[in-house]
């Protein structure tokens, strides 16, 4: 089930889920590490990365190098709604967003890709992706010198001994997929 980091932690802590995959800014690692340690959750790093610009392969941004975030002001940003630090409201927790007047908030990943396919002037910040997904949705993932936010994906689960075989198989698959993504 897809959700924000704090929602995912709640599912593991209170709703009986066995695993959660968190994504957060590396600078917030101490917050999550302490939060999980206090609650008896084990954290297993999956991947560190910088967000890249994801856009339509034939759109204007596919051919442009963005050196300053203000260059994105005339484009439409597709934004996942989980964009604040846990427990913070408004300004302090919001990071590197460009133009509040040109945003589309979309929670579900397939819908985000569909918009990027159909709106060549749209973009979003994205994690590394499998090449087959980029090709399927006619998208390109570009490094962006103007955005250097370091992110971390971490698997979280109750620290109660060994994982079940099917859970360990899932963890192994996550590591394999993370290693083979387009970065």
Where are each of the predicted segments found?
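Short hydrophobic/charged patches on amphipathic alpha-helices used for structural packing
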Residues: 6-13, 43, 69, 113
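Hydrophobic hinge/microswitch elements
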Residues: 13-18, 23, 82-141
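Short beta-strand->loop
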Residues: 37-48, 127-128, 136-150, 159
């Amino acid at each position: 089930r897809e959700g924000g980091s704090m929602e995912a932690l709640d599912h593991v802590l209170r709703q009986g889920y066995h695993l959660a995959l968190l994504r957060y800014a590396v600078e917030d690692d101490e917050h999550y590490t302490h939060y999980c340690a206090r609650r008896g959750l084990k954290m297993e790093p999956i991947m560190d990365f910088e967000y890249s610009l994801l856009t339509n392969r034939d759109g204007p941004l596919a051919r442009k190098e963005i050196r300053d975030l203000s260059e994105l002001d005339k484009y439409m940003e597709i934004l996942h709604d989980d964009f604040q630090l846990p427990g913070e409201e408004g300004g302090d927790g919001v990071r590197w967003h460009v133009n509040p007047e040109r945003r589309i908030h979309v929670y579900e990943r397939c819908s985000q890709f569909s918009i990027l396919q159909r709106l060549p002037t749209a973009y979003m910040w994205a994690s590394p992706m499998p090449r087959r997904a980029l090709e399927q949705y006619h998208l390109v993932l570009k490094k962006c010198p103007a955005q250097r936010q370091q992110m971390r994906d971490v698997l979280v689960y109750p620290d109660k001994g060994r994982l079940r075989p099917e859970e360990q198989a899932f963890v192994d698959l996550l590591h394999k997929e993370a290693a083979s993504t387009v970065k």
